Amino acid sequence: MPLAESRGGASGGVWGNAPTVFRALNSKKATNKGAGSEASLPVTSRSRRSAPKLLYPLLAYCRAEWARPDSRKGDILIMRQTRTVSLDTLEYLYIPDVTYATYGETQRKMQLIIPYRPQWQDGETVPLIVFLPGSAWYRQEMYNGIPALAKLAERGFAVASVQYRESKIAPFPAQVEDVHRAIHHIAEQLAKLFHIDMARTFLMGNSSGGHIALLTALRQAAGIADVSELLNFPIRGVIAESAPSDLFLCAKEGVPANMPATFHPTADLLGVSCPQEHPEKLAEASAQTYLAPGHAVPPILLLHGDSDAQVNVAHSRTLYERLTQNGADADYIELAGVNHGGAPFWTEDVLQIIADFIHKHC
């Protein structure tokens, strides 16, 4: 008889969200098999795959702890206790490497982390966060951040972590074009399937990803159609963490001392050897360029550590001042003693600030 049922929870489990049922054999079979034998505790799942080796110790533990009865009545095991548990967070699905655009032999992909319910209510949808990883505009690492992004999915937000073309492949504004193509792909292919409300789309990014999130929203607010053949979906808000917003300041300060001598992110993003000689390109890739009274700038949340050694905190301080001067809805959170990115931006306090910002503007 079934002893317990487990669905892949917030950690994704060994099989993600495929329902998994642990069963103990009847008492005779359980007695005949050794305590550590996986054969005495078979597993069935929706896909009917065999249990991964990583699960064997768990199965043995379940058999030892769950199948310990207070009394026996034939083959029926009577449990010692019954407990009621409640979940404060949603389960989620992780769908890796979804291709949204192809440029010759180059594919751009996204990672999807989607809230999961066994049964959705009619018309129930979730907001979308399009997340852009930081990478100094070079090739992004797309997998290490999944556990952190899953915390947002647990709070009820669909997350699409979007890989955009690195500067070595294409200079700015190719990265902004990729964001539009990713949003369009989600709207056309995925939104209905995963209960995503495209009218509640937010952009989020850290470091260079935050820069691309800002530029995508601000260029759209200024009436610039970066991908003319695609319909622009409304952007309800932007969350930018440790983001460079003033490329003139980047060019002036040069490469951080802890970076290799061959590291020239600003020059590579603009596709030039000396950024200072191309002020028009620096302006095109700077957020402040697109701020003007009357522009329909979406709400913006800026977060920055005051001890950032890679992206000067002046970027966010100055941008916040310019946003408020132009009548934009902007919030700025400065994290005391925090360097560039990392774990401080994924604490429960910061996640709650982000969640409150999204709920406020949904």
Predicted regions mapped to residue ranges:
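Alpha/beta-hydrolase superfamily serine-hydrolase fold, recognizing
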Residues: 16, 72-362
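Short, low-complexity intrinsically disordered segments enriched in small and basic residues
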Residues: 1-24, 30-38, 43-69, 74
